[in-house]
Amino acid sequence: MGNNQGKTLKIGSYHLNFVKQIAEGGFSYVFLVKDSNTSKHYALKRILIRDEDELKGVKHEISIMKRLTKHKNIVKILDYHKVSDKNNTEMFILMEYCSGGHLVEIMQKRLSSGSKFTDQEILKIFQDICESVAYMHSQQPLIIHRDLKVENVLLDEESGIYKLCDFGSATEEITRMKNKTEMQNAEDDISRHTTLQYRAPEIVDFYRSPVINEKIDIWALGCLLYKLLFYVTPFEDSGSLGILNSNYTIPPNHTHSNDLISLIKIMLNPDPINRPNIFEITNQLNLLRNQQPLFPSHKSNILLSYNENNNINNNNNNINNNNNNNIVNGKNIPKPLPKVVSQTTPTPTPPPPAPSQSPSPSPSPTVVNNIENNSNGLEHSNSNGNISQPSPTPPKRRATPGTTPSLQPVSFPPNNSNNSFDDPFRDSPRTNLSNNPFNVNSNDNSNSSNNNNNNNNNNNNNNNNNGNNITNEEILNIITQLTNNDQTNTFDSGLLLKLKSMKPGKGTMHIIVKRPLKEPLVCFKSLLLVHALLSEGNNIQFKSDVHDSKDLFNNLYLGWSKQKDRYLQLGELLSHYSLLLYKFILFHQKNYMIDGSFAFEEMKWGIPESLDSNNHPISINTIKALFDIMDHLFLVQNNLSDYCINNICSSNSSGSGNVPISLLQHCVNILNSSSYSIFCFISGSIDVLSKQFSDVDMKLISCVNQFQSMYTRLREQYTKLAQVPCFSDIFFPTLPNTAPTFTIVRSNSFNRLNSSLSDLNLNNNNNNNNNSNNSNNSNNSNSGNLSGNASLNSSFDNINSSNPFSTEPTFNPFSATTTNTSESGFGNFGLSEPTSNPSPRYQQSNNNNNNNNNNNGTPISLTPGSLSPVIGAKKPPLPPNIHHLQQQQHPQQQQQQQQQQQQQQQQQQQQQQQQQQQHPQQQGLRFPHSASLEDARLYTLILTPSSSPPLSPSTGPTTAAQQQQQQQQSQHTFDNFNINGHAPPVPQSTQPSFQPHVSFAPNVNINNNNNSHVSAPHSLNSSSSSISSISNPNLGGIAQKGSGNSLMPPPLYKPAARGHRRSQSSNGDEVRRRNLLQQQLEQNRDFLNHNRLLNKQSRMNNPNNLFDEGDSGFGDGEEEDEGLLN
């Protein structure tokens, strides 16, 4: 945008001259401008607006700034101006100019010079920021900034005041989530308007709190203060997991004040209720700077009460615990304030009571967070790598009314994944379950007493143990009820929801392992419970726990495989279901960033660096792993349907394995949810990869083809299960009518791509032939006939499909078979390389040996030439290299077609020569070149002595039909038009002596009920353009592109925008469509009769008429006419 230098702009009373560009964003730029009247400098923000939503957001930002412009610590807005034209809309916002620049730039300069901020400087900067936030929170309604960070703070060098800027993320709404839809909307909004490193736990895991309020700004201020002190954010390395567990490191040997460290820990409280408000923080900063509290009605010294609570905690500890090794071995991490020795910088105000320097204080039962645990434990963790620090995600408040389980002095496995600040699944080797698997005290208090290193702390935590024992007993009771052997007591959804709300973590699998899993009903319920918990969001602790017990599911798979002879279908179902969960566990262990519900969080993950990135959720490797899971999920669904059909539906009982129907229905619901979520995840991944990487990789094309096949199988599985009487009342996910398509741009490596595509196309054709031959022999051949050419074509579709449900079929389900044409009765007209796509309905009809009956009761075989044409389907041509590859696959057919073309050309030449000899004076009476396609069609129907056209494309030579399709695609003017292009050559004895000039009647508008189809351009009469008959199936096709009522052959090209919805239609749809066409033909009778009468009158009034009734195309005889109209 440097070309704006020297330009001028008038906004209100300001005459601005562009000086230079000082900042740049995604769709915005900030310029330094100078007012020519006052010579003052201002900042001008230029925002490019792409749609109405962005315009609404910019207007909202301007309204927020206008409300806040009076405060000294907020950048003032002076004026704004909107500029719009036909192509672009821009908004200019004029603001005051802060010459000191951004705070982050100042920090970088200070860091490079080696002179970091002192504590007094940090207090000044942080106080200015907090006062601006306090002003926002004091508004009615209050304003939440939501994007507080050092990058959004500016310095005014003249006044030395730091000012807050960038209010594009600000909101006036407090979000209250009541259901999953509102939760998903809130998550999308947060991902667009916040920065991950500054997000609070409640906006990382939305299940923590149903309310999102101004306390997220307090957490962001804690992260900002941390960065002012240590020049990094507290969760720079640990990411989302560190935020959820409040795991951050206080660097050892720091030189900052203990008050600043305590202030960080107060603001980084994982419980938003226990965080102070902005007014209390501002008052505390005033005290630290020897100033009067700015908000007297609020607390003025939150550090004092905070330190007093910690002193009480320290006094309640046993003085005998003065050995750090005992504490480390007992896994009881103390939680005092960080030790501040001689390095501590004195504050201007009298310091609060110093915390006890005892190395072994125990946690207080009144503290409801683990922040202190993090700070102190982190100091030790840098010096001693053997310390294991538990930091599980705090459960929901309603599930744990007492204290947080993370404060309990219990024993933890030495390799507990939550002890480190890295991702919990990074260390693959796991140990077996310990005797006390929970991260809280178990129901039996003797288990905790077995931990010899914690004996000194048991007496100080009895209150906490009692509250946690209640929670553990409740979890144990719920799991026992859900996995009992009572056939009447089915899977209670209420108990399951209650268990999910408790966020079960370590130790859950310890309870499930002790269940009698050799009983089929207990095992089935246990597998359902694990699957339900595994699919619930991103419960890191449970994923770690279930991964520790992954061998259980492998053993169940092997064990139930051996019991197939005894339990038949039930044993097979349990075996495959166990293996499916085993695959799920391994997948989540490797792809820990993907939650159990397979939510596609592109904004959170970012764009991958390569197609097969190992550490990114969006990659070819992840897609292939999900394909493997889906294959096994299909197998489990087949087992379910077979079991229900053979055991329950046939005997109206509970089956040989005594599995209740309600339990099977619950299993179907879980499998449906998982399969549909994986389908959407794969669709989104392929769409991102196809847009991000322009170079076509065969791995991506292979994934596209697998996805097409998976879509077909998934659709068939849903249909199959829905037909089972036991599952007839279950809701099944709604899939798009056709598989999503993706845009893949070919790069310069064209030769490599062509060779790869040739192999791929041959493989697809072979797969189609094998599937069609074996469809009656196998019930699992679900990859089907729709996955071959359709998937290959979709790989090069020009349709942008960011939404997996925004597109329609990428192929024409009723197109004709493959032919190669060069010239036909239409002359050199249209494209020279039509594409081909075999109709999936035709393949299905051949596989199932289905026949349709015509009006006379005669069975009509659905051959490629006799299929009904597509109505309204538009299909663009395939790339030239695809045509070339397809032409090479059928050399024999190509030779036959060439011979047919030569014969037709010879016949046409003979006809033209005879006409020239008989009527040389009438050679100029052919159809005018400027006429439209529709006029030419009607001209052909009226003047051509041909048999009546059928409802379906011709079963004879298809070259004429394809040439006619080329005409409609190219929309050229007529060149050497042959009126006999539709039909086989007419014998010489029946040919007319010459073709007279005919004047057409005005357009006749006939009511057409088929309003869903778009009429073709240059159409005379869309309702009069379709004439159907079944009596003569030897003529060409009658479906014109873009119109359901025309006499052109079916389109052979892929749709450019939206395709056809009839790929899944039945024979009943075909009959209804034919009846509709027949009705339209009857309506056209008057139009054709009218034109025939005009022809007769013109011949009677013309004394030089050279026609006789015997040679006329439409004489007095009505046989041909009746055949044409009926």
UniProtKB/Swiss-Prot annotation:
UniProt keyword ATP-binding present: yes
EC number in record: 2.7.11.1
Bias kind Low complexity: ranges: 314-333, 413-422, 432-469, 760-795, 846-856, 886-901, 953-971, 1003-1035
Span of the signal peptide: none
Any GO molecular function: ATP binding
Enzyme active site: D147
PANTHER family, sorted: SERINE/THREONINE PROTEIN KINASE, SERINE_THREONINE-PROTEIN KINASE DDB_G0280111-RELATED
Protein name (Swiss-Prot/TrEMBL): Probable serine/threonine-protein kinase DDB_G0280111
Species of origin: Dictyostelium discoideum
